[in-house]
Each structure stands twice: as structure tokens, then as C-alpha cells.
């Protein structure tokens, strides 16, 4: 239906748009592959992991000054050191659960039905949290208390279920724990860096035999498209949610999940 280059562009756009929005990039990629013949098989499964690095690079570029300052100061500045420890503490639960249960989660839950139900349920939760009488007391993503970082990391484990959304789980948990909307979103971005690099390294090592030099051009296309798209989306997303909240994204999830269920019921 599509050439490999067009598939790479479309999947790169889907990844760049959805990775940092609370709508589940994995869920959208699985549905795109299912309904639009955008590639399946070991190479394309690995491809969707590889292009996440483009989205991660976008976060590094956007927050480079802050991340560089923290990297330089983590051995001499208590606040920077606490933040690095907090990110690592939030990252650790996903490592443990992924190593123990990741294989079984992929075998049992990586299907379009689970994605659609997760999108709908997650949308309802996001809408509920967004409409709470929220009185935030944490306004700096780099200065949350350590227990808060740990709880956010535990919540992130729910995102191993396709359709839940890593950013959605971390943003919702951060807001319930007292973060304002912008701080919740920003910490979700920061936590994505080690989480997604770890997922990439693990999946790439397992599936390295499926990659050849013939694939480099296709991967490069997806990587660049994902990077450029993510830069635009992240900047717009922060501005939007600070003013308007997350209701739009909650409805997005519900609508996509419902349309997906209808398509599946009709035999697509």
C-alpha cells in the first residue's frame, strides 16, 4: 500500500506527535500499523523503537541548557544532585517490571483491542483528574520531594500496557501528588530520557539481527521526521496545557479508542 519511505515518514510523524502527549504513542503506532498497512514484522517493530530516539533528542535540544547545568552541577550542587537521584529513582521501577514482566506483557497485551480499551479508560481518568479542584504546591519539576519521584516512577509502569501512555501515567500521577500542569508535563519529559533510552537499548540488542545496512536510510528518515515533529509538538503542548489543561487530549483518546473498537468489531 505504501512504500517503505512513506511508511517511515508517517510513523515518524505519529511518533513525534504522540510520544510526549498523554495519548499513547505505542497505542497509536500499533493502530496505524493495523489499520493502514504501515508495516509489521520484526524490522518495523524495531523501527518504531529506533525512531523514539529522534523524539528523545528533541527533548535534549529543547532543555539542553537546563540539562547541561544539572549535569555540571550534580556533583557539587545539592539541588541538582537530588534531581538526578529523583529521576533515577523514578526510572528504576520500570527497569524492574520491564525485566521481570516485559516479555509477557508484549505477548499477552500488545493487540489493538487492549490499545482501544486502554485509550478510552485512560481518557476518562485524564478528564477526571483535569477537572479536579487542583491546588498544586509543586511548581518546579526539578525540585519534587524524593517520595513523589518514586510514586511517579511506579505509575509509569502502568504504561507498559499499550494504550495507557507513559506521559499520561506520569502526568496524572504528578498532578495527583501536587504538581502543577506544566511541572507535571516537564518531569514527564525528563523521565522519558532514561526510560526511552533504556527501552531502545534493550529492544535493539534483542532484535539487532533484524537490522541491516539496507535499513539505515529508512531509519534515518523516521528519526529525522520524529525529531522535527517532536520539537514542534512539545513547545506547543506546554503552552497549550498551561492555559487549557488536558481535556482535549482526554477526548482525543476516547474518540480514537472508540473508532478503533468500531473498526475492530467490523472486522478490520
UniProtKB/Swiss-Prot annotation:
Its EC number is 3.6.1.27. It is found in: Cell inner membrane. InterPro entries: UppP. It is a multi-pass membrane protein. One of its GO terms (biological process) is cell wall organization. It catalyses: di-trans,octa-cis-undecaprenyl diphosphate + H2O = di-trans,octa-cis-undecaprenyl phosphate + phosphate + H(+). The chain crosses the membrane at residues 43-63, 83-103, 109-129, 144-164, 184-204, 218-238, 246-266. GO terms for molecular function: undecaprenyl-diphosphatase activity. It holds the Pfam family BacA. The keyword ATP-binding does not apply. GO terms for cellular component: plasma membrane. Keywords: Antibiotic resistance, Cell inner membrane, Cell membrane, Cell shape, Cell wall biogenesis/degradation, Hydrolase, Membrane, Peptidoglycan synthesis, Transmembrane, Transmembrane helix. Bacitracin is thought to be involved in the inhibition of peptidoglycan synthesis by sequestering undecaprenyl diphosphate, thereby reducing the pool of lipid carrier available. Belongs to the UppP family. Catalyzes the dephosphorylation of undecaprenyl diphosphate (UPP). Confers resistance to bacitracin. This is Undecaprenyl-diphosphatase. It comes from Nitrobacter hamburgensis (strain DSM 10229 / NCIMB 13809 / X14). The lineage of its organism: Bacteria, Pseudomonadati, Pseudomonadota, Alphaproteobacteria, Hyphomicrobiales. The gene is uppP.
Amino acid at each position: 500500500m505504501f512504500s517503505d519511505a512513506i511508511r517511515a515518514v508517517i510513523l515518524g510523524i505519529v511518533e513525534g506527535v504522540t510520544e510526549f502527549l498523554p495519548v499513547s504513542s505505542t497505542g497509536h503506532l500499533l493502530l496505524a500499523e493495523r489499520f493502514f498497512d504501515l508495516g509489521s514484522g520484526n524490522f518495523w517493530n524495531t523501527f518504531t523503537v529506533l525512531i523514539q530516539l529522534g523524539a528523545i533528542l528533541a527533548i535534549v535540544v529543547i532543555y539542553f541548557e537546563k540539562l547541561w547545568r544539572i549535569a555540571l552541577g550534580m556533583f557539587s550542587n545539592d539541588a541538582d544532585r537530588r534531581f538526578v537521584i529523583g529521576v533515577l529513582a523514578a526510572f528504576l521501577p520500570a527497569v524492574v517490571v520491564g525485566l521481570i514482566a516485559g516479555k509477557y506483557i508484549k505477548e499477552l497485551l500488545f493487540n489493538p483491542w487492549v490499545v482501544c480499551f486502554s485509550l478510552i479508560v485512560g481518557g476518562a481518568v485524564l478528564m477526571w483528574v483535569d477537572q479536579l479542584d487542583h491546588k498544586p504546591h509543586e511548581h518546579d519539576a526539578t525540585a519534587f520531594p524524593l517520595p513523589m519521584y518514586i510514586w511517579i516512577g511506579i505509575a509509569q509502569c502502568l504504561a507498559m500496557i499499550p494504550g495507557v501512555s507513559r506521559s499520561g501515567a506520569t502526568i496524572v500521577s504528578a498532578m495527583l501528588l501536587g504538581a502543577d500542569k506544566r511541572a507535571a508535563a516537564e518531569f514527564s519529559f525528563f523521565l522519558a530520557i532514561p526510560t526511552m533510552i533504556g527501552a531502545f537499548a534493550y529492544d535493539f540488542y534483542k532484535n539487532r539481527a533484524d537490522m541491516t545496512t539496507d535499513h539505515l536510510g529508512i531509519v534515518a528518515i523516521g528519526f529525522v521526521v520524529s525529531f522535527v515533529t517532536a520539537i514542534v509538538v512539545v513547545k506547543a503542548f506546554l503552552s497549550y496545557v498551561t492555559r487549557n489543561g488536558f481535556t482535549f487530549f482526554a477526548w482525543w483518546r476516547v474518540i480514537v479508542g472508540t473508532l478503533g473498537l468500531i473498526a475492530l468489531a467490523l472486522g478490520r
